[in-house]
Curated annotation (Swiss-Prot):
The record marks 182 as: Enhances dephosphorylation of CheY-P. Its EC number is 3.1.3.-. Disulfide bonds: none annotated. Its main location: cytoplasm. This is Protein phosphatase CheZ. GO terms for cellular component: bacterial-type flagellum; cytoplasm. Keywords: Chemotaxis, Cytoplasm, Flagellar rotation, Hydrolase, Protein phosphatase. Homodimer. It comes from the Bacteria. It is found in: Cytoplasm. It comes from Pseudomonas aeruginosa (strain UCBPP-PA14).
Length: 262
């Protein structure tokens, strides 16, 4: 992802290099008033860069909220949110997977007795047939055996038809994979877009720190975050409609940013 050119940073660095040489020259020549003026210009240039980067970061954050259609003041915020939509889609995948798994297990449970019966009847008939081959049964026994064989063949045909139908149903129960696969791909795409936007915001926040001259102690920050993990936030503004320093919606944020040139 291309984060965009750092035109503001290049401009500030160019100004810094130019004024640094002039500042050294003024100090060497004893032109202290001019040197102070150059220092003030550098400070103003840094403040302008900081202001622009903070404005761009604020605009990007605001656009990210708008893009995902998350308005905490909207009564339909949950339905409008793409994140909520992704959650619903994943819930749909879970529901479809569970439904297919239950359907498959039910069909297997229905098929198991048919297979077991087929195996038991085959073993019994095989034993009787071995007795017949050893001439251990008489004519009446053979007629009874022939009748059992006929019944077995009829029952086997019926069971085979049921098994074939149930196997087809098991196969059809797996068609959820096509639908859920498409859903998962869409959610994955959304997660990738969110990650890309977050990386961009982190990069822009780094630019703000750069202009402000802020250096973070990451070890201390992680330790502090661990200590405050269970802390609660400030929560919503009380009587925000009566306060002039609190914006009340997305339109107010847009107007504010536009008035500042962002």
């Amino acid at each position: 992802m291309v984060l965009g050119n750092d035109s503001t940073g290049d401009e500030f660095e160019s100004t810094l290099k130019k004024h640094a040489r002039e500042l050294v020259d003024c100090l060497e020549r004893g032109h202290f008033q001019q040197a102070v003026q150059l220092i003030q210009e550098l400070s103003q240039a840094r403040d302008r860069g900081l202001y622009q980067e903070v404005g761009k970061l604020t605009r990007e954050l605001h656009n990210a909220i708008v893009d995902f259609q998350i308005d905490p003041h909207s009564p339909h915020a949950q339905e409008m949110s793409q994140i909520a939509d992704a959650t619903d889609r994943l819930s749909y995948v879970v529901e479809m997977t569970e439904k297919a798994a239950n359907r498959t297990m039910d069909l297997v449970e229905q098929s198991a007795p048919l297979v077991n019966q087929l195996g038991d009847d085959s073993r019994e008939l095989h034993q009787e047939w071995q007795r017949f081959m050893r001439r251990e049964i008489d004519a009446d026994g053979f007629r009874e055996l022939a009748k059992r064989i006929e019944q077995f063949l009829v029952r086997s045909g019926e069971n085979a038809g049921q098994l074939s139908s149930q196997l087809n149903d098991i196969l059809l129960a797996q068609d959820y994979q096509d639908l859920t696969g498409q859903v998962i791909k869409r959610v994955t795409k959304l997660v990738t877009e969110v990650e890309s936007n977050l990386v961009k915001l982190v990069w822009m926040a780094g630019q703000v720190d750069r202009y402000a001259g802020i250096e973070h102690d990451h070890v201390s920050m992680r330790h502090q975050a661990a200590l405050e993990r269970s802390a609660k936030g400030e929560g919503p503004q009380v009587a925000a409609e009566k306060r002039e320093d609190v914006v009340s919606g997305q339109d107010d944020v847009d107007d504010l940013l536009s008035s500042l040139g962002f």
